[in-house]
Amino acid sequence: MLTSRVTDLRGFLIGRLPVRIGLTQSNLDRAEEYLLDISHPKSPNYGKVWTSEEVIAAFRPSESAIEAVTDWLASHGIIDVTHSENKGWLAFDAPASKVEALLQTVYYEHEDQITGGVAPACDKYHVPKKIQEHIDYITPGTKLMAPVKSDVDLKVKREGQKNRRHDRVKQPAKQKFSEQLFNLLSSNSSDLSTCDVAITPACVAALYNITAGTLCVPNNSLGIFEAELQYWDQQDLDLFFANFTDWIPQGTHPIDEEIDGGIAQTDNISLAGGESMLDLQLAYPIVYPQTITVLNVDDIHYQTWENDTYTWGFNTLLDAIDGSYCTYSAYNETGDLPNWDPTYPDPGPDGYNGTLQCGVFEPPNVISLSYGGQEADVPISYQKRQCNEYLKLGLQGVTFVFASGDSGVSNYPEPYGFDGPTGCLGPDLNIFNPTWPNNCPWLTNVGATKVYPGFTVFEPESAAFDPGRVNYSSGGGFSNVYPIPDYQKAAVDLFFQDHEPGYPYYEGLVPDADNYTLPNVTALAGNTGGIYNRIGRGIPDVAANGDNIAVFVGGEFGLSGGTSASTPIFAGIINRINDERLAIGKSPVGFINPVLYEHPEVLNDITNGTNPGCGTDGFSAVPGWDPVTGLGTPNYPKMLELFLSLP
């Protein structure tokens, strides 16, 4: 955020500053251990999910840290200090002169050159060395700086072009097809002979051996995240049900959870969203009679925000689920990040005029999210703070299922994407460009497969590739921010041992950084000539069908696709498994990756196809895990049997 100094606050020493001190959390070095303890199938504590109170207690700052900081404040005459409910904050108001003496600094008012807002800040502040280890962040603190330019910005100068780095993982491309094809598909909705042309619910059921659902266990509604004006409409749902799933009654619709001004539904069929209709029309045939809850976040102003750093409202969702996240301090960042996240109340004409919703609803056990961007375009601290929250919710039994992206090992090239002419990184624009937020190790991310022309649902699928859709292929690769997690290491090691990709590589992870610093992949790769990171978290974990999906949008029949389609399929299957476990008194499955990597036999291994990008063929789908289709596609009966066998 660009700022300019406006007023020296030394002229207003009688004024009071609201000060918040974010305390360093304890036990973050044990977070992975805690999560694996309840999610690894060999652990005696498998399935013993934590409460939110237990999570707060496990990571709260130590008593010695709290005592050290409060004693330091008291030595400067600051005694009236409040300790936040989430235990991560100390808060007090004090005269500006006293705060300046405490921190050995001078406060000024700084004006945001973008918004015109004015806030107190300083150029630097001092904390005694013995106190530093206990403090993560102090606000008001140093003025916020503009984001470091990305690799692509350094190479490609865009004149007069808006840089929408965080384009949806893939805007489902709804292709219109002939009335003859529609009549053929709808006249016999159980016909499997045309699944290489169009994927219907019958095709999905046949591919993954999914039986009809019978359970509707309370408090197990499947969560589907939507943003970017992706509204659902009843008319399209009813058209789909009538033609392809006549066992689902007309009028069946999701529950709307509208967060901070979000709008989930429209009565205007012309405003129906391709993403939302795709998600619902894939998920309903799998989970029905179980319900679906649409989680729509942020007001119209932010959903159409021209600021290219809007990050889909994931933090808005997490704030609404976990109130402590609203003020959670980590990696020198506290709460939502200005100019990246919305600020509420929003007084604009389309704004949500209420306060930020914090901890207002219980999360679904499974949440499907078909949105995202590129890892290199999101601040390091922002990513890691958010990733911590996914882990904490995993401890509470929540499964997050993300799409892996639709442009292979790169982003879409211009003009379809906004990471330069190749969609790749580095000075030569040839370094692979992994996606976010599915780079976080505590999520399950889903690649895409396809029934190739001339093949049937009774034969193995292949990795999705459709050159007619801007070279759409299954997103995959290796993170530059996170290391290979323990649960994945054996599978990744075997991939490199048996299926060496043959490309030059580099090894390293970007260091932690403050505020708006982006991952510098050029510096990370150095002079190695490498085009991918050999030691990063592998993407994706699993896969499901993601091309030629039959869908109704805006009253019209067409075909759609993307990992946006694969994700609700896989999430729906996990939700079905939760129904079965909950019905017999067991916990939801929560973080599923350790179980799947320990038991890859419950998935259909995909061994054909690639995910091209950056002037290469990308990686190849091979026996075992690979960075194209992960461990493979779901086999519902095998997965159900396995998860029911666990405590």
Q: Where do the PLM segments sit?
A:
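Substrate-binding/charge-relay-adjacent region of secreted/lumenal peptidase catalytic domains
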Residues: 1-82, 91, 96-402, 406-408, ...
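C-terminal substrate/ligand-recognition segments
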Residues: 540, 561-579
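Polar, glycine-rich mid-to-C-terminal structural blocks
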Residues: 441, 445-495
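Active-site glycine-centered loops adjacent to acidic/histidine catalytic or metal-binding residues
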Residues: 405, 562, 630
